C-alpha cells in the first residue's frame, strides 16, 4: 500500500512540476492539470476504499465531477483561444482585454 501512495504522490508531483515548467502552451498546462486531478481522484478512491466508511464514498465522485467540468471548460477555452488568436501560447494572451 505505501508504494501505491508513493506512486500517486509522484504522479501528482510530476504533474505539478509539468504545470510549472511547461507554461508556454495552454494545451500542455491543461493536460498537466488533468493529471493532477486524476491522481488526486485515484488517491481519494484508494483511501476511501481502505477506510470502509460509507461517509467518505461520495468524495471521489465529487472530485471526478469537478475533473469533468474542468476538462470541459478547459477545452472550450482552448478552442476559443485558438480560434481567436490562432495559437495557444499563454504569453500572447492578455485576458484583461475586451
Swiss-Prot record:
Cross-referenced Pfam families: Oxidored_q2 (PF00420)
Chief localization: mitochondrion
InterPro entries xrefs: NADH_UbQ_OxRdtase_chain4L/K (IPR001133), NUOK/Mnh_C1-like (IPR039428)
Reactions catalysed according to its record: a ubiquinone + NADH + 5 H(+)(in) = a ubiquinol + NAD(+) + 4 H(+)(out)
Signal peptide bounds: none
Transmembrane region(s): 2-22, 26-46, 58-79
Topology class, membrane: Multi-pass membrane protein
GO cellular component terms, semicolon-separated: mitochondrial inner membrane; mitochondrion; respiratory chain complex I
UniProt GO BP: aerobic respiration; ATP synthesis coupled electron transport; proton motive force-driven mitochondrial ATP synthesis
Name this protein carries in UniProt: NADH-ubiquinone oxidoreductase chain 4L
Amino acid at each position: 500500500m505505501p508504494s501505491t501512495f508513493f506512486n500517486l504522490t509522484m504522479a501528482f508531483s510530476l504533474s505539478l512540476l509539468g504545470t510549472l515548467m511547461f507554461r508556454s502552451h495552454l494545451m500542455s498546462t491543461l493536460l498537466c492539470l488533468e493529471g493532477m486531478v486524476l491522481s488526486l481522484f485515484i488517491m481519494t478512491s484508494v483511501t476511501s476504499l481502505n477506510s470502509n466508511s460509507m461517509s467518505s464514498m461520495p468524495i471521489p465522485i465529487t472530485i471526478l465531477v469537478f475533473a469533468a467540468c474542468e476538462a470541459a471548460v478547459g477545452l472550450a477555452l482552448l478552442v476559443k483561444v485558438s480560434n481567436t488568436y490562432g495559437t495557444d501560447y499563454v504569453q500572447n494572451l492578455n485576458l484583461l482585454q475586451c
